[in-house]
From Swiss-Prot:
This is Casparian strip membrane protein 4. Regulates membrane-cell wall junctions and localized cell wall deposition. Required for establishment of the Casparian strip membrane domain (CSD) and the subsequent formation of Casparian strips, a cell wall modification of the root endodermis that determines an apoplastic barrier between the intraorganismal apoplasm and the extraorganismal apoplasm and prevents lateral diffusion. It is found in: Cell membrane. InterPro entries: CASP/CASPL, CASP_dom, CASPL. Glycans are attached at N142. The chain crosses the membrane at residues 28-48, 73-93, 111-131, 161-181. It comes from Ricinus communis. Keywords: Cell membrane, Cell wall biogenesis/degradation, Glycoprotein, Membrane, Transmembrane, Transmembrane helix. GO terms for biological process: cell wall modification; cell-cell junction assembly.
Length: 191
């Protein structure tokens, strides 16, 4: 039976819960900062790899030159621009992420940040999916449309654009983790 006073064990567990929640929230915010840095590196690498991709085939004739550049296809240009925009956003959002670590009370700015995270996730996914369809056609071709695969001849070009896609898909996974971390962080603040 309980008496009027609170037992020592119950009081200690009640005091430990807010501290544990603050430490968990601070850990989530630090992980958010680290993921933003890695996401910026991945998107910057993808944009640079795509933007500097070109290959010219050697030819025996002076009149014919076969060249493949990323800006020959609008999907690759959209991919490079989308990755550049997302990289700029991630660099700019680092300031807010550091602010949240220092002052964890900024709920409105967290909601704004997760909203922009979702918008950037959609933009990055659109760019990566558009470029993926063209990379698939470059590697496999399409027999019914009589499109031959050109990665047999432009292997360096195709390797660079494929590597660029890998970096972009890593960034998509990072953005998914950022949105999940934001939801967990909001839940821990509310409770």
């Amino acid at each position: 039976m309980k008496t009027g006073s609170v037992e020592a064990g119950e009081q200690a567990s009640e005091d430990a819960t807010p501290r544990r929640g603050k430490k968990l929230n601070r850990g989530i915010l630090i992980l958010d900062l680290v993921l933003r840095v890695f996401g910026a590196i991945c998107t910057l690498g993808s944009a640079v790899a795509m933007g500097t991709t070109s290959q010219t085939l050697p030819s025996s004739s002076q009149f014919f030159r076969f060249r493949a550049k990323y800006n020959d296809l609008p999907m690759f240009m959209f991919f490079a621009i989308a990755n550049s925009i997302v990289c700029a956003y991630l660099v700019l959002s680092l300031r807010l992420s550091i602010f949240h670590i220092i002052r964890s009370a900024g709920i409105i700015t967290r909601i704004i940040l997760v909203t922009f995270d979702m918008v950037m996730l959609v933009l990055l996914t659109c760019g990566a999916s558009a470029a993926t369809s063209i990379v698939y056609l470059a590697h496999k071709g399409n027999a019914s449309a009589n499109w031959l695969p050109f990665c047999v001849r432009f292997s360096h070009f195709c390797n660079r654009i494929s590597g660029s896609l890998i970096g972009s898909f890593f960034s998509i996974i990072i953005f998914m983790l950022l949105v999940i971390l934001s939801a967990v962080s909001q839940f821990s603040i509310c409770n």
